[in-house]
């Protein structure tokens, strides 16, 4: 089973985020393999161990994003692809999906594409579904568990009301939740081996895309630091409690 896993180099979510205008500051900020993508890498590795094949990592970003690819390789993935181009600075989820789709098509045929549900730096959650559309693949989202078989993939899908068990013929795309597995730690041997594993670095030209093809067609209306939550107010009901709660909700524009 040949598996493609999408990975992202994100600012360390354990550190305070900084803004650079209307974008999240990335230059000079410590980055990591996005925690959500670790579950995708682990899912790919478990399927490879069960069915054979290869796991190829795909990422888009500046040169420093190679660190995230190497991290995934140290976990056990076989090779990686990084698409890096100055024209991609500030790319949105739509552009990211378009570029990753072109890279996956160029790299060869894959039985399964795996992605995390959403990244910790953007939380849009739209990229994987858009990627499936560009690739023309069926998609199974929010997988809590998965099981591969010859020619099919079956997942237990988390929903608001419980779980659905769904299956799809391959090739397909799936997104995995944080509860799908326990990502393995990279061993020292794995870290050293990752340095020698092949990583292709492509530009837009290598994908036969131009700067016009990746023009961002949407803009951020505004960005700001979220206000800290204020301490709640305790109301002792002396007969006017309901009215005071109603007034509070009206002030908050809830009702």
Give residue ranges: language-model regions.
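N-terminal glycine-rich FAD/FM-binding segment characteristic of electron-transfer flavoproteins
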Residues: 1-255
């Amino acid at each position: 089973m040949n598996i493609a896993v999408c990975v992202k180099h994100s600012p360390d979510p354990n550190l305070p985020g900084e803004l650079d205008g209307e974008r999240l500051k990335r230059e000079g900020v410590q980055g990591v393999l996005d925690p959500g993508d670790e579950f995708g890498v682990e899912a790919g590795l478990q399927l490879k161990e069960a069915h054979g094949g290869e796991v190829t990592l795909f990422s888009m970003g500046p040169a420093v994003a190679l660190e995230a690819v190497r991290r995934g390789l140290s976990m056990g993935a076989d090779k990686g692809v990084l698409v890096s181009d100055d024209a991609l600075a500030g790319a949105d989820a739509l552009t990211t999906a378009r570029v990753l789709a072109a890279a996956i098509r160029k790299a060869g045929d894959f039985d399964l594409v795996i992605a995390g549900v959403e990244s910790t730096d953007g939380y849009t959650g739209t990229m994987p579904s858009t990627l499936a559309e560009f690739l023309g693949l069926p998609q199974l989202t929010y997988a809590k568990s998965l099981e591969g078989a010859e020619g099919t993939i079956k997942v237990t899908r988390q929903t608001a009301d419980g779980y659905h068990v769904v299956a799809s013929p391959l090739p397909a795309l799936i997104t995995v939740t944080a509860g799908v597995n326990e990502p393995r730690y990279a061993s020292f041997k794995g870290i050293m081996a990752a340095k020698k594993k092949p990583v292709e670095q492509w530009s837009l030209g290598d994908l036969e895309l131009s700067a016009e093809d990746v023009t961002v067609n949407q803009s951020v209306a505004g960005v700001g630091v979220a206000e800290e939550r204020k301490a709640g107010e305790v109301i002792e009901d002396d007969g006017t409690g309901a009215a005071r709660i109603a007034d509070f909700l009206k002030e908050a524009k809830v009702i």
